[in-house]
Amino acid sequence: MNFKYIVAVSFLIASGYARSEENDVQSLSQREVLEEETLREIRGIGGALLSAGKSALKGLAKGLAEHFANGKRTAKGHEVMKRLEAVMRDLDSLDHPEEASERETRGFNQEEIANLFTKKEKRILGPVLSLVGSALGGLIKKIG
């Protein structure tokens, strides 16, 4: 009788422990799913903001390119035009990163790919802002 009692209690303890482990694993996987969904939402918002920023920069760059294309070109204006064209190509490559950098990203893991695009965006935004500033400064000087 004592042996059966010990076996039954041991079985109950083992099954209770297994259930608690199973619950821990389920709650952990639920937390991971929630974290993944949150990250997707954040990436979606960031992607939308980045897309809007790229569209605005594209529109501004196109406007500046048209302005410089219509007037007389000096050496400085020609250089600015070439930079704007390069920026436009880079912005287009950001819209289709899988096509534009397929050769560059082969063999990289996801984190390295994300770092590559972040560096590329920083590399593009710096010259774009300086070009916009210099173009607006030139326009203000001509107007004033």
UniProtKB/Swiss-Prot annotation:
Expressed by the skin glands. GO terms for biological process: defense response to bacterium; defense response to fungus; killing of cells of another organism. It is found in: Secreted. Residues 1-18 form the signal peptide. It comes from the Eukaryota. The modification Asparagine amide is found at N70. Its main location: secreted. One of its GO terms (cellular component) is extracellular region. Belongs to the bombinin family. This is Maximins 6/Hv. It comes from Bombina maxima. The lineage of its organism: Eukaryota, Metazoa, Chordata, Craniata, Vertebrata.
